[in-house]
From Swiss-Prot:
Protein name in UniProt: 1-aminocyclopropane-1-carboxylate deaminase
Active-site feature positions: 78 (nucleophile)
GO function terms (MF aspect): 1-aminocyclopropane-1-carboxylate deaminase activity; D-cysteine desulfhydrase activity; pyridoxal phosphate binding
Species classification: Bacteria, Pseudomonadati, Pseudomonadota, Gammaproteobacteria, Enterobacterales
Keywords from the UniProt entry: Hydrolase, Pyridoxal phosphate
Function: Catalyzes a cyclopropane ring-opening reaction, the irreversible conversion of 1-aminocyclopropane-1-carboxylate (ACC) to ammonia and alpha-ketobutyrate. Allows growth on ACC as a nitrogen source.
UniProt organism field: Enterobacter cloacae
Keyword Aminoacyl-tRNA synthetase applies: no
Family in the record: Belongs to the ACC deaminase/D-cysteine desulfhydrase family.
EC number from the UniProt entry: 3.5.99.7
Length: 338
């Protein structure tokens, strides 16, 4: 596998820390050891997150092409767009963000706090759009790029989740490579890695990265899109492309992609009671914050897998915390009583 042939622009602190979730493990019976990989604090740029790690492999192309404006898209409380805004500010570039109405949630402050507030503070041109949630290339995003060109700028397109970019999976191939180094220091290997999946490139990169040591099927994606067929197809397509890029040496198959579809509902961006319980439980036992859109759902999934005995006794399970806590303010009504 050859990741080193791709240029990387450093935006993170390096390998994110691994912390044991001792109290949560004990609360769930103590038969499975839970750990967290803290991608939620991987950078000093506006709280970081998994997209910041992905952007390390996209930004060299933007610089090489002489682009002056990063153009991205997400929902109103998109973590992606906040991280793109932070990187643009860091590099001295302009930033245009299309924020679509992906979530059927009507909190009075939803479009004024959290991620979107931070993007505005960092100087991004934030454009609200009424379009609902879907996966793939969006007309509103293409129009935003055309607008930049018409105004004499040179846009660099960053699709939702970085996932439609050819290099969108590389950051989490690197994640797997760095984790192997950390495992050597810890003196053990993780039996399973749990990760949230929506647009697909985070899990796709992990699948490729861990295929190098035979653990691709040990990456358990937890769907948060409520469109699991689309998400799984995305993961597989991106993983196959990424495997070719890094010269993995074998084909990625459908069997390599494990996606648990039980925890995404009622729909994208809206938590169920199990997700809210998981957010409160992890927060109160570990001081680790997760959000109702992504990480709360993958945390819910991991907790339920432990409760149901789906991990063999003695397993060491790594929860990939991808970020997302800045969105909590937008859901303040749900937590008005804690």
């Amino acid at each position: 596998m050859n990741l080193n042939r791709f240029e990387r622009y450093p935006l993170t602190f390096g390998p994110s820390p691994i912390t044991p979730l001792k109290r949560l493990s004990q609360h769930l019976g103590g038969k499975v050891e839970l750990y967290a990989k803290r991608e939620d604090c991987n950078s000093g740029l506006a709280f970081g997150g998994n997209k910041t790690r992905k952007l390390e492999y996209l930004i060299p192309e933007a610089i090489e092409q002489g682009c002056d404006t990063l153009v991205s898209i997400g929902g109103i409380q998109s973590n992606q767009t906040r991280q793109v805004a932070a990187v643009a500010a860091h590099l001295g570039m302009k930033c245009v963000l299309v924020q679509e109405n992906w979530v059927n949630y009507s909190d009075a402050v939803y479009d004024r706090v959290g991620n979107i507030e931070m993007s505005r503070i960092m100087g991004a041109d934030v454009r609200l759009d009424a379009a609902g949630f879907d996966i793939g290339i969006r007309p509103s995003w293409e129009k935003a790029m055309s607008d930049v060109v018409e105004q004499g700028g040179k846009p660099f397109p960053i699709p939702a989740g970085c996932s439609e970019h050819p290099y969108g999976g590389l950051g989490f191939v690197g994640f797997a490579k760095k984790l192997r180094q950390q495992e050597k220091e810890l003196g053990f290997k993780f039996n399973y890695i749990v990760v949230c999946s929506v647009t697909g490139s985070t899990q796709a990169g992990m699948v490729v990265g861990f295929a190098a040591d035979g653990r691709s099927k040990n990456v358990i994606g937890v769907d948060a899109s409520a469109k699991p067929e689309q998400t799984k197809a995305q993961i597989l397509r991106i993983a196959r492309h990424t495997a070719e890029l890094v010269e993995l040496g074998r084909e990625i198959t459908e069997e390599d992609v494990v996606l648990d579809t039980r925890f995404a509902y009622p729909e994208y961006g809206l938590p169920n009671e199990g997700t809210l319980e998981a957010i409160r439980l992890c927060g109160s036992l570990e001081g680790v914050l997760t959000d109702p859109v992504y990480e709360g759902k993958s945390m819910h999934g991991m907790i339920e897998m432990v409760r149901r005995g789906e991990f063999p006794e003695g397993s060491k399970v790594l929860y990939a915390h991808l970020g997302g806590a800045p969105a909590l303010n937008a859901y303040s009504f749900l937590f008005r009583d804690g």
